[in-house]
């Protein structure tokens, strides 16, 4: 049986990440990149699909864990009848090779420990050839991959696994270092695990020290910022949506997607979260990734790209993995990369506008690229698309897609007004009026008193909560207040927000999914804009309670099973948490910042 997602903690080196369960098993690790094949895939199968267990032999051991200070170094404390020990798990910031370090330290008495290492390359399908090198290093090779393990513990082979049993006493420190490298090269050089620990903690402490986050929810926001940093692919600045694939949105269902890619839709809210927290280097790197990935013909702009901007993200299914909680299929790649989703044009142009407002300089070529996007958008904004939820049914005229088309032209006008850029402002103003009138005429249902998911539909959609946030209409407008009331009435489940009604059968998939956590943060943001601060704070604190013991959130939450579902941890959820906390803190307000971008009273930053 699969372990609850709540049982997992994240470690990473800003190029890939691993999930460590409460019982001391690393059940998911893709090497050397987030989107590489997994060498530990027990998360989506069984222990025989790859894992690394390091745990007390005593099944009654009491386990507690935490991240050491403000870092991504995980410390698990083990208490038995005979003693106590801690296991320290981390991945040093990437050097020449990729390492996972595990250090067992004796705290009191003695603790008997077991380790079981099952390496299975290519998502659990390939058993490697394992041998011992003259210096005692264990080496596993299959195809292009090599993994070496170094430890003073005497390892031995048993039934295609590597196992050991040892005792740690008070004052002992027993390290394990596992390193990945290409199989055609010599075994990677060893590292000093204690020095690596000091350097890793220093890396995270120095990074957190740059933060401007203060106030009541600073701890939660800082943990979410650390999670975003861990999900950033450092060589390019791209931010993966999650380090996992195919964790189901509905237990036992088919809504299982690969999220190890970078979505343009996350652009604006991510930039605001990073800039407001003081992380301009990361914001600049994300902006630069955005420009590189989207470069080329505007008609070929995709909704998502690979870590380095790769465009071919071909989707296929792997049959040998039974799936998390037997939820199949297990998918690699994501076919949504080829969908038409018109909202991404507005997201890209809004993100670049917010970067400008934040003082991040852009070149003439960057502006030319944005103008080319706008010229293309003029000819396609009325086309039906798959919408922001990437439905796999027939394309439709989604209301939010049209709203974001308006945002694209609106932000272009503001860029000209605020920064002296050149452009056909009169034509763009006419486009804004045309799109605004079109949305208000066809995207609003007078009988419902609410905006609707798509033109002519009676369905609601949580994306409509973003209409005041992007400045399309003020939160005081009766149509916005009616939309919020309708969503409260029809999309709330146990106080949390569904994306839309999957039972309607319009998205091309069987019904059923959890509540989408980012949508509940959007409702809290709408409450802030409507001056419903008490409602916003209560909802926000309810969402904080959903986090697991180390502060992580998945994509969704199953209110019936009372457990997280969907890919984990989810960047979108953590970005939404950061921005809502900042909105509530009243110091830096991403919702008001973004809405204010639509109006002329915004002032440019001092460079």
Located regions from the model:
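Acidic, mature catalytic/reactive cores of soluble proteins
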Residues: 1-607
